[in-house]
């Protein structure tokens, strides 16, 4: 009789992937990266175990938007003080801090639990074409779309 495979920390093999964000659409890239971080692209996926891989995203400043989202999409944060609501458009955030734009999008697609926080720490986003993770020997990852 066969038993169902259950992944645990001892039998997970993690890889490092590099994804070039140049010319990619924000949402399509984010959803695919979130699936890699969760481990859903593997046959050993187990919902309650972190089976995901590490992802390095380069050229985050060259991400693209569809439609008028660059002007219309707004990001909000609040300081918890009266009148402390801050807002910034997606285009302005892309110019000032493209790494935060991608991190916000991807981490919003991960679970809001301790496991989701752990999975989110395997994401590394860089605005330029260089990254300091050459020692991990990352593989290039081709997106489906």
Swiss-Prot record:
**Known InterPro entries for this protein?**
Ribosomal_uL13, Ribosomal_uL13_bac-type, Ribosomal_uL13_CS, Ribosomal_uL13_sf
Q: Which family does it belong to?
A: Belongs to the universal ribosomal protein uL13 family.
What Pfam family is a match, any one? Ribosomal_L13
What is this protein for, i.e. what is its function? Answer: This protein is one of the early assembly proteins of the 50S ribosomal subunit, although it is not seen to bind rRNA by itself. It is important during the early stages of 50S assembly.
Q: What are the protein's UniProt keywords?
A: Ribonucleoprotein, Ribosomal protein
Residue spans crossing the bilayer: none
GO biological process, alphabetically ordered: negative regulation of translation; translation
Q: What subunit structure does UniProt give?
A: Part of the 50S ribosomal subunit.
PANTHER family per record:
LARGE RIBOSOMAL SUBUNIT PROTEIN UL13M (PTHR11545:SF2), RIBOSOMAL PROTEIN L13 (PTHR11545)
MF terms in GO: mRNA binding; structural constituent of ribosome
Q: Which organism is it from?
A: Staphylococcus epidermidis (strain ATCC 35984 / DSM 28319 / BCRC 17069 / CCUG 31568 / BM 3577 / RP62A)
Top-level taxon: Bacteria
Protein name in UniProt: Large ribosomal subunit protein uL13
Supply one GO CC term from the record: cytosolic large ribosomal subunit
């Amino acid at each position: 009789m066969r038993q169902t495979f259950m992944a645990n920390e001892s039998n997970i093999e993690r890889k490092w992937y590099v994804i070039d964000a140049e010319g990619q659409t924000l949402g399509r890239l984010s959803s695919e990266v979130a699936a890699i971080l969760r481990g859903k692209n593997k046959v050993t996926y187990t919902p309650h175990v972190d089976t995901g891989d590490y992802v390095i995203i380069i050229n985050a400043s060259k991400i693209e938007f569809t439609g008028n989202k660059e002007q219309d999409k707004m990001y909000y944060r609040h300081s918890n003080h009266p009148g402390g609501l801050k807002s910034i458009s997606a285009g302005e955030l892309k110019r000032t801090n493209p790494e935060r734009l991608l991190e916000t999008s991807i981490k919003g697609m991960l679970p809001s639990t301790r496991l989701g926080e752990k999975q989110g720490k395997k994401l590394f986003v860089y605005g330029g074409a260089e990254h300091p993770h050459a020692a991990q020997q990352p593989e290039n990852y081709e997106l489906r779309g």
